Swiss-Prot record:
EC number: 2.7.-.-
Family annotation (InterPro entries): Stealth, Stealth_CR1, Stealth_CR2
Keyword entries, A-Z: Exopolysaccharide synthesis, Transferase
PANTHER family, per database record: N-ACETYLGLUCOSAMINE-1-PHOSPHOTRANSFERASE SUBUNITS ALPHA_BETA, PTHR24045
One GO BP: polysaccharide biosynthetic process
Broad enzyme group: transferase
UniProt-recorded name of the protein: Capsular polysaccharide phosphotransferase LcbA
UniProt miscellaneous comment: Stealth proteins are part of a protein family that is conserved from bacteria to higher eukaryotes. Family members were first identified in microbes as proteins that help pathogens to elude the host innate immune system. Microbial stealth proteins are involved in the biosynthesis of exopolysaccharides. Stealth proteins are predicted to function as hexose-1-phosphoryltransferases.
Length: 364
């Protein structure tokens, strides 16, 4: 009877609610319906804020400016030298290195929404954002500071990420960001680390086995499968879930342990100038899962909107974020990923969309 009354009183709302229940809108990788996100986040954030954290937490970005002529020359020279059959899918695609000024907004989101961060490191290849003035809070780290020169220059994110623990003065607890990941709302340090130092493991609902069965062929999947195989062989622990495409809480000591235990495996791919299907992805899979095996990470929830920056759908996601902002129901984060330059695009202009969304969070 109540449903009948609702239908006659507000037929539009009745139909909307019926469709949302039967076909829920899902914008994240943990497969949480949009209308349930806020319930989970409110309770999670309340719990994560209860116990203060008294240790320093840093943030690390990796970044490249593909408009830099000197960098472009190095990139083109080495791109011509690689064997196309040896590198992974899209490994040399220009989209992997495209700079839409995302770092400006990602960094701004960290400064605005994570004010408790001690220091921010930006790992680059002889570059510095034109709009940024480095300081004690925000430091530029060159590839030569952390990677042996015999492996440089490198255009392989897996190689760069394998050396993050060598950043001078880096805290034991740090959060790794790609520059296409953005904090969407204020978050406590407890979202990333417990007060006893345990890291959050932001698991996705995706399955490595299913992705492989469907024929997915990317360096990321190959690196995850290889990492999972090594960990399963040594610890009899089967891992089938990648992480959500968002920031990654990490422990420097687990990086160092990875190098002690698996130096030969790690050194085997350091000479790969571009990503291949024979790499390991330390920062985004191997170290987080080894942390879990060692008891210093626990599965946690991060609701991250993940979308293709080149797709016309990007505007739809930003509209959803704006609506959520007005309602106070924003997700934890979002990732505007630049998939590949061969995809058709309606020129969603991600820079314009970011500038509108982060009107008051830009740094420079």
């Amino acid at each position: 009877m109540r449903k009948l009354k609702k239908f006659f009183k507000n037929p539009g709302i009745f139909i909307r609610d019926h469709l949302n229940k039967k076909y829920p809108v899902i914008r994240n990788e943990i497969e949480c319906a949009e209308n349930e996100e806020d319930i989970l986040m409110r309770h999670d954030l309340a719990l994560e804020s209860k116990i203060d954290i008294d240790f320093p937490i840093d943030v690390v970005f990796t970044w490249v400016d593909d408009t830099d002529p000197t960098w472009q020359l190095r990139y083109q020279q080495h791109k011509l030298q690689v064997n196309a059959e040896h590198v992974g899918r899209y490994a040399t695609d220009p989209a992997r290195f495209s700079n839409h000024d995302e770092l400006r907004y990602s960094l701004g989101s960290v400064l605005k929404f994570l004010p408790w961060v001690r220091r921010i490191y930006i790992v680059t290849d002889q570059q510095c954002p034109k709009w940024l003035t480095p300081s004690d809070k925000i430091r530029i780290v060159d590839h030569t500071d952390i990677i042996d020169r015999q492996y440089l220059p490198t255009f392989n994110s897996h190689v760069i990420e394998a050396h993050l623990h060598k950043i001078p003065d880096l805290a034991e607890h740090f959060i790794y960001f790609n520059d296409d990941v953005f904090v969407a709302r204020p978050l406590p340090a407890g979202h990333f680390f417990r007060s006893n130092g345990i890291a959050s493991l932001f698991m996705s609902n995706k399955s490595l086995a299913i992705m492989q069965k469907k024929g997915t062929d990317t360096p990321t999947l190959s690196a995850s499968l290889k990492s999972a195989s090594i960990l399963n062989q040594d610890f009899s622990f089967l891992i089938d879930h990648p992480l959500v495409h968002t920031y990654v809480p990490l422990r420097k000591s687990i990086f160092e342990e990875s190098w002690r235990l698996y130096r030969a495996d790690l050194k085997s791919f350091l000479s790969h100038r571009f990503r291949t299907n024979h790499d390991l992805n330390l920062a985004t899979f191997f170290v987080p899962w080894l942390s879990y095996i060692r008891g210093v990470a626990v599965p946690s929830r991060d609701i991250c909107y993940y979308f293709n920056a080149r797709s016309p759908a990007a505007a739809t996601y930003f509209k959803a974020l704006e609506i959520a902002k007005q309602k106070g129901t924003l997700p934890h984060s979002f990732c505007a990923n630049d998939f590949n330059s061969k995809e058709k695009t309606k020129d969603s202009n991600v820079t314009l969309l970011l500038s509108r969304y982060f009107k008051d969070a830009i740094t420079g």
